[in-house]
A protein has these predicted regions:
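Conserved lysine of the Walker
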Residues: 35
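Hydrophobic positions on the alpha1 helix immediately C-terminal to the Walker A/P-loop
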Residues: 38
Length: 190
């Protein structure tokens, strides 16, 4: 992301904070685009709370063929809405159960205190079931070659193959079905 794009994003967030008691922003986009990195930078600079869509992967019993055939259904958006967004919209502390991939199960509850600014980062953050909860929606993109380079550097060649075969096609289907790059308030290159 260019410094100018980052500054523009900060300006938009600060303007929202000047006008509203609470702000909830979503950072969606392609894997490897820098969503987690951007959220961490914003958290350090703005003292906000951050929630990761990776903590809301589907549990094994939810991964039905019918569900996965629908764009954007590769995340437990129902649980995310009830455990995170509804309390955040009320200005309350959030208690949620992160999904742990290694165990394929929900972990012990985590409580995050209320904050004026809440950032939600990760693929599927702008799912239609969650869309209206946000004051700002950001789509982060990356070109295909750089995406693969970043994923391999972060996860290794074995995981890269899984991303190419499974995760990237699921994400791209979701982005296309809901026209996210065009619908989000901001589309930035990560």
């Amino acid at each position: 992301m260019t410094p100018a794009d980052y500054d523009r994003l900060l300006t938009v967030i600060r303007a929202l904070l000047d006008r509203q008691t609470r702000v909830i922003a979503a950072i969606d986009g392609r894997c490897g685009a820098g969503k987690s990195t951007l959220a961490a930078q914003l958290q350090a600079q703005l003292s906000c709370r951050v929630f990761h869509m990776d903590d809301f992967f589907l549990r094994p019993e939810q991964r039905t063929a019918a569900r996965l055939a629908q764009p954007g259904e590769n995340v437990d958006h129902e649980r995310f809405l009830s455990e995170v967004l509804q309390p955040a919209l009320r200005g309350e502390a959030v208690t949620y159960h992160p999904f742990r991939c290694a165990r394929q199960a929900l972990d012990e509850p985590v409580t995050v205190q209320a904050a004026r600014l809440t950032i939600v980062e990760g693929a599927y953050a702008c799912h239609p079931a969650l869309w209206d909860s946000y004051d700002l929606r950001v789509f982060l993109t990356v070109d295909a070659a750089e995406q693969l380079r970043r994923i391999e550097a972060r996860s290794g060649p074995e995981k890269l193959r899984m991303f190419q075969d499974r995760w990237i096609p699921l994400e791209e289907s979701y982005f296309t079905a809901f026209d996210l790059p065009a619908r989000c308030d901001m589309a930035l290159k990560g």
